[in-house]
Amino acid sequence: MSTTIVDGAQAPESAVTKPLGMRKNGKQWHAPKKAFRPGSGLTSYEQRAKTRVAQAATKAKEKELKEEKEAERKRRMQALVEKRAAKAEKERYELLAAKMHKKRLERLKRKEKRNKVLNS
């Protein structure tokens, strides 16, 4: 048997509600209303925190995938630009070769390569 003492005075105090005072608009006969928030209290804070973490993880993954896709696109574009530049240079040398002697053309190529290295 337990030896708990129950005070009879505590129960009636909690049952008595505190008066709210006079209403601002003067309609004391109306029952006080609370804000209508049907969604509040349906999900716990832990649940909301979990969903936020999950959404953040998904967003990070999506961002990573987008960055990878963009990097791949830039790499392909750069390869295409380099390929076009090489093709244009080759055509230019072919036109020069039609006009110049072979040895002179080789010297010109070497000279241009030295200038490229110096300028870059």
UniProtKB/Swiss-Prot annotation:
Is Transit peptide among the key words of this record? no
Keywords assigned by UniProt? Coiled coil, Nucleus, Ribosome biogenesis, rRNA processing
Instruction: Tell me what this protein is called.
Output: rRNA-processing protein CGR1
Query: Does Transmembrane helix appear among the keywords?
Result: no
Give positions of region: Disordered: 1-47
Q: Which residues cross the membrane?
A: none
Family affiliation: Belongs to the CGR1 family.
What the protein does comes down to: Involved in nucleolar integrity and required for processing of the pre-rRNA for the 60S ribosome subunit.
InterPro entries, A to Z? Cgr1-like
Gene assigned in the entry:
CGR1
- Where in the cell does this protein reside? Nucleus, Nucleolus
Q: Which residues form a coiled coil?
A: 54-114
Cite a GO CC annotation: nucleolus
